[in-house]
Amino acid sequence: MFYTENYDVIVIGGGHAGTEAALAPARMGLKTLLLTHNVDTLGQMSCNPAIGGIGKGHLVKEIDAMGGLMATAADRAGIQFRTLNASKGPAVRATRAQADRVLYRQAVRQALENQPNLDIFQQEATDILLERERAAGVSTKMGLTFRAKAVILTAGTFLAGKIHIGLTNYEGGRAGDPASVTLSHRLRDLGLRVDRLKTGTPPRLDARTINFDILAKQYGDAELPVFSFMGSTDQHPRQIPCFITHTNEQTHDVIRNNLDRSPMYTGVIEGIGPRYCPSIEDKIMRFADRTSHQIYLEPEGLTSNEVYPNGISTSLPFDVQMKIVNSMKGLENTRIVKPGYAIEYDYFDPRDLKPTLETKAIGGLFFAGQINGTTGYEEAAAQGLLAGINAGLFVREKDAWFPRRDQAYVGVLVDDLCTLGTKEPYRVFTSRAEYRLLLREDNADSRLTPIAHELGLIDEARWARFNRKMDNITKERERLKQIWIHPQSEHLNHINGLLNAPLTREASGEDLLRRPEVSYEKLTKTAAFSPALEDKQAAEQVEIAIKYQGYIEHQQEEIEKQKRHENTLIPERFDYSLVAGLSNEVRAKLEQHRPVSIGQAGRISGVTPAAISILLVNLKKQGMLKRGE
């Protein structure tokens, strides 16, 4: 049965990847359909009620800089905001928000329902239609067929999902939701490489049964940060604290004594779990010398009694979960509202994707989110945005776009996945980026908003505000260059009050701000350099750009050297068997990975600099040496 309307883009799945994937092409003016098994769970935070963190906050800022939704939703739902690594350098500072699940979901749904060019339909997708090795639409469980020129799959943990609690298991996409079994079988028939991964979640606790009076409180920052470049603290709801407790020897004994009932330690679960968010069972076994682990009790919302105990993800049986919880300080009489569980699910080898997240085998079919082997809301949303952009460009038959590693954390994420693949759930860290001083949270807009404007992703109000900010930064830097303080200046005493050593020769405002003891805020409070910029975001960029100018210029020089190879493209169907001098091992790896550029080829493990030289010579001989943008 064919539906009466055709679409440009269809998105399967309404999680964090799916919502961004649907909004992007709709903003670009393309007729888009979002298919979800349940409209009421659009934007659902299935695991921890938080957005951001180290590396992850950077992704949220980048999504926002390109017109995405996540930052705005987090600002409207955040009930505790903190800047992590605030005392460290600007490259690793990161925003994190504890979020009210209901408010977050409401913000997402409101944005989706009010987005022009976007339709939402509640129905389970069971098949992807193909014509001449290209995606042509989707069919659903009730027999409806929707036609489209591009399809984006963002199925999360739903593909052949299996939930484990103790030695009991059953099909499910997450607690309370069915798995997508039919679609999983169909996708396996397409010849794509499929494997299994595992993730988990802790039990949810009843706040009314927790003794908060004897627990340490963790408050948010006094000066509240915001996620969105268009946001303000006025959007934040009421702020509340989290609480901290700890596991102890009794907790650890309970876990060790019940490992024979753990699906992970009895071989029932075969999928590999996230390295950086291990289950409490894994923590106890891997860090056997530790007598205690810190557990954060995170409220799930302003109107909810549920509490998320961050740090005790588990798939042990329910009776064991109760003993674990009741063994901890403040939780002696606590009730569990929802049991913790582990979930195994299908994921696809991301090396079978182009950096645009289009599958190499099937034109117009894009994958985004956990099905590409990642973990985390932010990683999923970033992929959804990129897939949505490129699905739109594909439909319009325009050149694809994806960010470089030196351009965005999204670029680092996608390059790591598509070049190296992953055998465990992948998450972003600042340490994964070679040029992290250039990929800061504060400058995500200057890196990406002009591109978003060119792609049609942002409105004129945002574009005008961005340009005002950039203009203010330029003018302020020039102003600080022009103001000089000399040893006879009437302002000398005020300036010397900021310095570790008195000024002995003339210095400009820029010179003074380069000194580690001088901040922009302090400098612009002096009569010589007031007034300060009213825009705190612009002021922050001015200070960082001046203080770290030497380091930034050094990284930019390194990037220019790398670009020579990064922008040297390899033809899509290049025949490596014709390249004399390559070892069989290198040839096999290049055939397997199909890198899109010389730079990407050089990051494949085992592909030597000598092999790259041979490849460059061969491309030149065949007249295929082509530079990208």
UniProtKB/Swiss-Prot annotation:
UniProt GO cellular component terms: cytosol
MF term (GO), any: flavin adenine dinucleotide binding
Gene Ontology terms describing biological process: tRNA methylation; tRNA wobble uridine modification
Keyword entries, A-Z: Cytoplasm, FAD, Flavoprotein, NAD, tRNA processing
Residues the entry annotates as binding FAD: G13, G14, G15, H16, A17, G18
Record bears the keyword GTP-binding: no
Record's protein name: tRNA uridine 5-carboxymethylaminomethyl modification enzyme MnmG
Annotated NAD(+) binding sites: 273-287
